[in-house]
Amino acid sequence: MGRDKDGNVAMHWAARGGNVALVRLLLSRNCPIDSQNDANETPLHWAMRAGTRGMAVVQLLVESGARANLYSRSYKRPLDVAAEGFRDQDNDDNDRALVAVDPQERRTTRWNMLRYSSQCRTLVLHHHECLDHMAKSHHDWEVPDRIDSIMSTLASRTFASCPPQDDSKFNSCEITVSNEFERATLELLSRIHSADYLAFVNELSKELDRKRKQQLLENVQNSNDSSEMSGGLSQEQHHIVPFTPMIQKKFIKEAKTKADGHSDTSFSAGSLKAARRAAGAVQHAVDWCVCLLESAVLLRVVLVGRNRNAFCVVRPPGHHAGINGLLSDAGSCGFCLFNNVAAGAMHALSDEKHRPRCERCAIVDIDAHHGNGTEEIVRKCHDSGRLLFFSVHLYDCDKPKKTNEFNYKFYPGTGADDDVPHNVINVPIAPLWREKEVIKSICTPTNGNGSAATERAQTRLKTKADSRVSSSTDLKSMSGNNEQQIGDELQNAFAAKPKSQLPTSSPHYPPHYLMGVGRLAYRRAIQHRLLPALRAFNPDLIIMSTGFDAARGDVGNARHYVNGTQAMGLDLEPEDYAWTSRKICEVADICCNGRVVSVLEGGYGRTPPSIPPPPLAEPTSSEEVRQPLEKGFFSECAMHHLKGLVDPYAE
């Protein structure tokens, strides 16, 4: 088989020129369809590089058995180089026009391939049983409408044929939406939770189900007596009970428990099924992203995923659920029943006949709250060297606790330090309500230069326009030049300070103040703490605890006061979630063939602008909210996150 100086065969050149007849002829002569050149690129890579002129060849190659999951030396699949041209191949003037990638041509070329290669699509999992976990009222934070808002927004933006110039929409060939998966088994849940906790939840569910059925029967009888056939259950008749106080009494053995009216976490007759279905979604996603498929063309078993990655749109969330559900120092279950991501990780690390074993799994938690339950499970894992837990979160706790009283100022008040022996990396971020203290911690009052540098930096972009960046924000400038410039200024400010004034040596300035506040601090945590750690750990699978409660205006990252005011702790934009997804997917392409499973955690919505913020009894409660939260921005963040999973290399 003849090759040119770069290792290309005739099939590469035929694909590059979009010559369908020649490609068909070469296939009839048994020319290798997946022959790789010196850059490890196949003819399918080259057909995709050619843009629209190679679309017919892409269809022919895929239908003839070309492997769409092969990576080049730059860790890209054919789908990832759509319409990029051949800028590094030669000096052909005809191909120079392709150096600047046309976004519309790129999307058109991608959609063409995705129509014939379903394994490159993103899997979106949801299930109606997740709606049966009922909250105390429709105006609570963690409600079924969270799932409905995401799925309805996705449905309204998904089209079989959408214009390539509109990058806010999804083509139906980019995603596979499914509700065909089983509930998590008791055996799987027993790997992460204690037998006593599982038995308690099961008995509670049976008791509430008996009451629900009895109530239905009484309703039917009353309807017959009054000749009104209503028969359904009202919100008050669902027998919803406060969950946190029950766990405190059963497992924590506390004399003083959370008041029932202040319990954010509820349990209803449908909660157990919903929680098992949520964990089952992650289990299913792991199996579909890491599996064995029989290739009839190659006559061998190859390691590929049926989907490139997955997004589990499920509830109740789980990252606060520890071995016994509630952790002794948490004060609240944080809306969580079973730890979905931990269940998925343990399933991935187990031996399964139908798929290869994952030797290492990384859990990345980007929720505004520390994943204390996940950390506890990872710490207790019998082989923690196979697990990595990373969490970036808000942290505000002035002093260590000296009593049993909860004195944290932002739930759950944990996650201040790393635990290197157990592969736990915590990156706490100071909330925006501490911004003045953060600025002061890196200021040098006696040094004008240091103060000026800090004034320019301030760890997040100074102006209101920058702190309220719209969807037109240039992500590259945000994560590149701007961040580098501000980082340099901060470093100069630190260098100018006397050693005695460094935050690490002062009890008034905690070490995590060095990260700064807001969006820039968050991006620094991802860029400089997460990505190097992921690359070094080299996982076979990455599972994301994806909470959207760090978004600007979300009640989940706010500090609520009894006078009705609230102070926001983070200000992430939808673009930040897309950027995070893409960065993690880029590392996943290097380490684990792009295997990423994202699982919905927090994110609740905003207080409607026409309604003043309601007074809350404590920072973690939502019982006083009188109107449903506005979920448009929450859904927008979810859509951008999904966009990052669907197309990690979008410009």
Language-model-detected regions and their locations in the chain:
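Leucine-rich solenoid repeat scaffolds
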Residues: 62, 68-103
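HDAC/HDAC-like amidohydrolase catalytic core signature
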Residues: 99-364, 368-651
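Conserved ankyrin/ankyrin-like repeat signature
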Residues: 21-22, 56-57, 90, 94, ...
